[in-house]
């Protein structure tokens, strides 16, 4: 199945000059969504890990079925003020400003092996912020997986020494 056929391109969103890759047609199609999750799960099956860490909001869409399918725990990472317990945080640069991610301070135990999951790997900024959060908690990131990788933004220059799984590449 050609998963790119289920991605909608939206030019100039969220700002002029950006080509937004919309995953909603893929996730609303049961066959395409299942195929995408199964493809990522098969690759992740090669790694020994305990937990999946993912950012809101679209990261949850990809990570939750993977956690279920692979029988792994899921650690949601959220924007400030969204988690009810004590958190650790990381501030990072975006294309158009700064962002902050929070994770419960007890979400990851020392030496737990973790995989980072998100919908799109663009510049690598969010993935690196997630990696720093995992490491602050004492965890070890063993791999990362995304539905889409925007290779033209060169995220692998930022995410070094970390396996990257992405069935759709632009």
UniProtKB/Swiss-Prot annotation:
Keyword annotations: Cytoplasm, Glycosyltransferase, Purine salvage, Transferase
Enzymatic reactions: AMP + diphosphate = 5-phospho-alpha-D-ribose 1-diphosphate + adenine
Cellular localisation: Cytoplasm
Superkingdom per UniProt: Bacteria
Single GO cellular component term: cytoplasm
A Pfam family: Pribosyltran
Pathway per the UniProt entry: Purine metabolism; AMP biosynthesis via salvage pathway; AMP from adenine: step 1/1
EC number(s) per entry: 2.4.2.7
GO biological process, one term: AMP salvage
Entry's family note: Belongs to the purine/pyrimidine phosphoribosyltransferase family.
Its job: Catalyzes a salvage reaction resulting in the formation of AMP, that is energically less costly than de novo synthesis.
Subunit-level organization: Homodimer.
Protein name: Adenine phosphoribosyltransferase
Species for this entry: Fervidobacterium nodosum (strain ATCC 35602 / DSM 5306 / Rt17-B1)
